[in-house]
Swiss-Prot record:
Assembly with partners or alone: Homotrimer. Forms a super helix coiled coil in the homotrimer.
Similarity comment: Belongs to the phi29likevirus major capsid fiber protein family.
One GO cellular component term: virion component
Described purpose of this protein according to its UniProt entry: Protein that forms the 55 capsid fibers. These fibers are not always present and may have been lost in some lab strains. They may enhance the attachment of the virions onto the host cell wall.
Pfam families, A to Z: Phage_head_fibr
Keywords from the named record: Host-virus interaction, Late protein, Viral attachment to host cell, Virion, Virus entry into host cell
Domain of life the protein comes from: Viruses
Protein name as catalogued: Capsid fiber protein
One of the GO BP terms on file: symbiont entry into host cell
Subcellular location: Virion
Originating gene: 8.5
InterPro entries found in the cross-reference section: Phage_B103_Gp8
Organismal lineage: Viruses, Duplodnaviria, Heunggongvirae, Uroviricota, Caudoviricetes
Length: 283
């Protein structure tokens, strides 16, 4: 227990919540402000200016006049004129009722500030309003603009975040983001043949696909590519026979026969048959 002398700052009624203050080297007591954490409770009536001895005990419960009807288990805070009231605000809760009471009656309050405390962005004191809006996920376009000014120094990055990049901004952003010259050329839409080859080497690991993209696949690579896409092997047209549909060569041109006798005519006809057989016709 510890005691000290204090003076009543105003009329104080017993069983009301108090706060301490100092004035001219004296300690003064008065009713605790509404929605604050009280420092003590009065146990006797006092007039303004009365001198009293305050004895501080490690009390675990106070008896206080209820401002309103209170039920057992209600969390409580300071009400009007040092009375106690119900609350759901964890920031000003200092205890909970262990018995019910009607308005104007004494209620026993167990002292405890060990509650889950909910802190909202508005509780953060001098924090910038734009930051509070960001924490509450309800930023306006103006908030976003102000936050970019707070968080980002580079003008090109700001332009990117605001969705208003110029060609100059884009070029500088590419320099900020990429070190590879071929990638930069690709993003700027100005690739040379060397850039294209280097980009293909960056992007593709399969040698067959690289050969295809470089337009120089050899025969084995072509076979590999056909296998990769499920095309199988090339189709070879069979030779035409009397029973098989197939391919034939184009027969070379044959001049008109100039035969004037049967023997020469037969010779020219046989030459025609030979040309047809050479072209793949079975006769």
């Amino acid at each position: 227990m510890y005691s000290f002398t204090a003076y009543a700052n105003s009329v104080i009624v017993a069983f009301h919540l108090l706060k301490f203050s100092s004035s001219e080297n004296n300690i003064e007591i008065s009713y605790a402000d509404e929605d604050t954490i009280p420092e003590y409770v009065s146990i006797r009536d006092l007039n303004a200016g009365d001198k009293t001895t305050v004895e501080l005990y490690p009390l675990v419960a106070w008896k206080v006049i209820a401002q309103e009807d209170i039920s057992t288990g209600d969390r409580v805070s300071v009400g009007k004129n040092g009375q106690v009231k119900k609350t759901t605000d964890m920031r000003t809760t200092f205890g909970y009722a262990v018995s019910p009471a009607k308005a104007g009656q004494l209620v026993t309050v167990a002292i405890s500030t060990v509650f889950d405390t909910i802190i909202t962005p508005d509780d953060l004191g001098d924090v910038d309003d734009d930051v509070k809006a960001f924490l509450k996920s309800n930023t306006t376009d103006e908030n976003k603009s102000n936050l970019r000014e707070l968080l980002v120094a580079d003008a090109d990055v700001k332009a990117l975040l605001s969705g208003s990049t110029t060609d100059a901004n884009k070029a500088k952003l590419r320099d900020l983001l990429f070190s590879n010259l071929d990638v930069k050329a690709f993003l700027s839409g100005s690739t040379s043949e060397d850039n294209k080859v280097n980009l293909r080497n960056l992007l593709v690991s399969n040698p067959a696909i690289l050969a295809f993209l470089n337009a120089n696949p050899d025969t084995d690579t072509q076979t590999t590519l056909r296998t990769m896409i499920g095309a199988g092997t090339p189709y070879t047209l069979p030779a035409a026979t009397t029973t098989t549909l197939g391919g034939v060569k184009r027969m070379p041109a044959i001049a008109n026969s100039t035969a004037t006798d049967v023997a020469t005519l037969v010779k020219d006809f046989n030459n025609l048959l030979a040309a047809l057989r050479t072209a793949g016709h079975s006769l």
